[in-house]
């Protein structure tokens, strides 16, 4: 891992670019190799695990949550139940933190989990990531639950790998915004 960091530093590649460009591109190439049967399950698992390890190492250099931006926005980032693709959510969380937004990630939350969380923590927005067409209905339920728990006060955005293929279906979930453009979410929701 250190050798890889050294190579990126020698090429003057910023941490942000590693996280927002190179890691996602590597994940896309791994996915394409899997789809075309050039690599097997074990190779995909190991490769994605290494990308997550690299991302984790990069996150130690981005400390918005630990700095404690008292007036900064707080976002709830949700990976829906059954969703297997989590790397994108981790990249989004890192980028939000880099921009000064505090992020709480929850994986596969149930209704009671969200109820407890919303009762004890104030969030400025919720972002739901979806990578599978099978999760559109679950996203709609999450949007409805969040709206109910916050009496419609919290804005919700949906993003992820299927946005380009299922934008219309995702728009019908009731989310305020459906996009993969994080800058647009930050701007529209006034997060920074």
Curated annotation (Swiss-Prot):
Top-rank taxon: Bacteria
One term of GO molecular function: metal ion binding
Classification via InterPro entries: Cobalamin-bd, Cobalamin-bd_sf
SUPFAM superfamilies: Cobalamin (vitamin B12)-binding domain
Any Pfam family: B12-binding
Protein name in UniProt: Uncharacterized 20.5 kDa protein in bchF-crtJ intergenic region
Coiled coil spans: none
Domain B12-binding, first and last residues per copy: 72-192
